[in-house]
């Protein structure tokens, strides 16, 4: 029989009492009052912060956006089909953040930085807030390096610099995404990390872009953030900020980044949907009053950092869709006023077979020639003026029955200049090829050729110059200037190729 020793029991109880730590844990909890349309109204959560993540009983995450006197309006980052009225919600004490790092290169992810390309998990130890403050004035420096798009019309007349925000605007089906993807393809070998953000697009369109980038070897340095048309409005609204956080990671690591938002009209529509469901007062075109801030805080994150911070850069190319060419609508005017210029794509030019369909007359870069190398500045200086004069004369020529010889020559020159701006999709040109093309057109070497032969001649001239005059490329690459030697080499190549081309054409006619 076991004897019970009272002193032993007393010692054990005393020991336990001494070890007892009375810790009171207060949880910031609430109860679901109403749920539907990816919006939940919560009673409680008295100490929740604006933008704080909240977690529902069944695991769905939401963001507290509306802090009202008697309830909290939460937008859901999922369908929320299992959330019931009366179920509990707890505040997490965290603001939305995502993992970032080199491992994301070449991957397709969603707004929560989860992979959606079926290639397994992405491991990363670094994190960045989705909503981060833009660099201040002291943290920036003026833009001075060009970001080459590979498109003659842009690089010569609407130059983009590293750290700039340049809007691509136009109606649907005018080639906005094509301009953006061509720019990504042209960054190959330029040590630029690209982030492509697809907002509210068809899954097939996103897949097409990814396939194009893979075929051209551009996915190696590109991250695709995609929230398709069937995604909740909350995730479509967050996707651009996720892309910006990823690009910022590389920018602050002293690297150069390019981010494309395709497109911000759909993000604004998703935000409008959320705001109306949260019963926020509607303003112009039913958008909420802070829709300008929605885009300004996103686009201000693009910057060219100061030398103290490593001179990294983040160049933003936001895309905005217009209706029937109306650039005076609410979202287009907002984004135009935030950005450092716009590239306007025209339906009429697109239908006339001028692609990329860039309307040079109303497109502008507010950084200008600061984002061009000296060689391009020297050669392309007159191009925009000549095209503007040609457009004016062409409009007049429709009504005039007979024109003098000078006007006829100017029209012929203008038509050839317009022809040399045409480019096939996914066929970007190097700076040397662009300078060669513009110089040939501006100096009248193409005037004697029939209009239909211009592109053929330029392609052959480009091949001839690469093969027989490699020194031309070397001079431009090393000095970035259009020296007398480079000009002499180019003139010689044009003369040689013109003779060969005309002989060849004559032989074909005779045959």
Swiss-Prot record:
GO molecular-function term, one example from the UniProt record: proton-transporting ATP synthase activity, rotational mechanism
Q: What class of enzyme is it?
A: translocase
Record-listed E.C. numbers: 7.1.2.2
How is this protein annotated for GO cellular component?
plastid membrane; proton-transporting ATP synthase complex
Localization per record: Plastid membrane
Does the keyword Membrane feature in the UniProt annotation? yes
Site entry (Required for activity), positions: 363
Q: Which InterPro entries match?
A: ATP_synth_asu-like_sf (IPR023366), ATP_synth_asu_C (IPR000793), ATP_synth_asu_C_sf (IPR038376), ATP_synth_F1_a_nt-bd_dom (IPR033732), ATP_synth_F1_asu (IPR005294), ATPase_a/bsu_AS (IPR020003), ATPase_F1/V1/A1_a/bsu_N (IPR004100), ATPase_F1/V1/A1_a/bsu_N_sf (IPR036121)
- The entry marks the following residues as binding ATP, namely 170-177
Q: Which PROSITE patterns match?
A: ATPASE_ALPHA_BETA
Topology versus the membrane: Peripheral membrane protein
Short name of any one Pfam family annotated for the protein:
ATP-synt_ab
Which of UniProt's keywords are assigned here? ATP synthesis, ATP-binding, CF(1), Hydrogen ion transport, Ion transport, Membrane, Nucleotide-binding, Plastid, Translocase, Transport
Per the record, what are the reactions this protein catalyses?
Answer: ATP + H2O + 4 H(+)(in) = ADP + phosphate + 5 H(+)(out)
Q: How does it assemble?
A: F-type ATPases have 2 components, CF(1) - the catalytic core - and CF(0) - the membrane proton channel. CF(1) has five subunits: alpha(3), beta(3), gamma(1), delta(1), epsilon(1). CF(0) has four main subunits: a, b, b' and c.
UniProt family annotation: Belongs to the ATPase alpha/beta chains family.
| Functional description taken from the UniProt entry | Produces ATP from ADP in the presence of a proton gradient across the membrane. The alpha chain is a regulatory subunit.
Q: What is this protein called?
A: ATP synthase subunit alpha, plastid
Q: Which organism is it from?
A: Cuscuta reflexa
Q: What is the lineage of its organism?
A: Eukaryota, Viridiplantae, Streptophyta, Embryophyta, Tracheophyta
